[in-house]
Amino acid sequence: MTQTLQVKSRINDYPIIFTDDIFQPLNQFLAEKGDVKLLFITDQTVFDLYQPLFRRFQQDYDSYLHIAAPGGQSKSLEEVSRIYDRLIRANFSKKDVIVTVGGGVIGDLGGFVAATFYRGISYIQIPTTLLSQVDSSIGGKVGVHFKGLTNMIGSIYPPNQIIVSAKFLDTLSEREFACGISEMIKIGFIHDRKLFQQLLVFPKDRNQEQLRQMIFQAICHKKRVVEKDEFEGNLRMSLNFGHTLGHAIEALCHHELYRHGEAIAIGMVFEAKLAVQQQLLSQQDLEALQAAFEAYQLPTTLEAKSMTAEALMTVLKTDKKNSGQHIVLILPTTKGYISFPIAKHDNHLLDWLRSLLDIA
């Protein structure tokens, strides 16, 4: 069974196709493109698991393959340069297509290449992790890390098509599954407390049909937000809850100790604690948020004992959401969220970071 959501964009509208058949939905878009070349960008793990998918398109299209370096290290200008070389050697033109098959790292990397090669070529996202299905593949954010700073170089460049299949989730580790749940908890806590409550009880039975419904709900919320605020003027900032601190934690751990969903979980708990201190959020809500993460064995405290408040502060000062001399945090409230600016030289922020590290 196939279901389609159409996402409106000021750049180009695009469909999100939900299907159990990962081989067919691409054909309509590619048929309209005519005789095109395809460059598949993936990683070794996904390639080994889904070789039939790649072979299927090799039969019908002039297709090429780029296997990126493992983990977050592939979100780099060096990897981008290697892909440019691959495209040039294969004589790709502006009408040809990039297809990303993988998690958020692969989607961000391939999308950035598509956005910048010939000033923009078509690309298709096939997200294979829960996190990339409900979050990173939707909305057109693409980019790479630079000198240890998360997503420092990037753009907003929507895909031409997204293929979402729950079948990919069958091969996810528990840890990767939990990382995707982390982003769903964020969406539920800020935008849909009913979804949040469903996520609280879901680990007890793991009903697959319920999981599909929750994925669809989370995607619908992300779709609604990016349609209303594609370029992150206000509403889309709500999706950055946990990400200011989370990205700083990722950077200081060199994207190795914590995966994205784990760092964001810690960031959400830390930022929710500040919201409680500011009387924006109840202690009961904070405890419910912590309980949700703990239900999926997601971390809520820092294990990196060598991390200091001063080091966190240094990275926070480079965050792309900052405004002038203010570090901007997205804090949850009882009924939603607020943008909370703190002066970069405010000693209270440093004291708060120290207190969080002591609690951890």
Curated annotation (Swiss-Prot):
One of its GO terms (biological process) is aromatic amino acid family biosynthetic process. Zn(2+) binds at E183, H243, H260. Pathway: Metabolic intermediate biosynthesis; chorismate biosynthesis; chorismate from D-erythrose 4-phosphate and phosphoenolpyruvate: step 2/7. One of its GO terms (cellular component) is cytoplasm. It catalyses: 7-phospho-2-dehydro-3-deoxy-D-arabino-heptonate = 3-dehydroquinate + phosphate. The keyword Cell division does not apply. Keywords: Amino-acid biosynthesis, Aromatic amino acid biosynthesis, Cobalt, Cytoplasm, Lyase, Metal-binding, NAD, Nucleotide-binding, Zinc. CDD domains: DHQS. It holds the Pfam family DHQS_C. Binds 1 divalent metal cation per subunit. Can use either Co(2+) or Zn(2+). NAD(+) binds at G104, V105, I106, G107, D108, T128, T129, K141, F168, L169, D170, T171. One of its GO terms (molecular function) is metal ion binding. Signal peptide: none annotated. Its EC number is 4.2.3.4. Its cofactor is Co(2+); Zn(2+); NAD(+). It is found in: Cytoplasm. Its main location: cytoplasm. It is an enzyme of class 4 (lyase). Catalyzes the conversion of 3-deoxy-D-arabino-heptulosonate 7-phosphate (DAHP) to dehydroquinate (DHQ). Belongs to the sugar phosphate cyclases superfamily. Dehydroquinate synthase family. HAMAP family: DHQ_synthase (MF_00110). NCBIfam families: aroB (TIGR01357). This is 3-dehydroquinate synthase. It comes from Streptococcus equi subsp. zooepidemicus (strain H70).
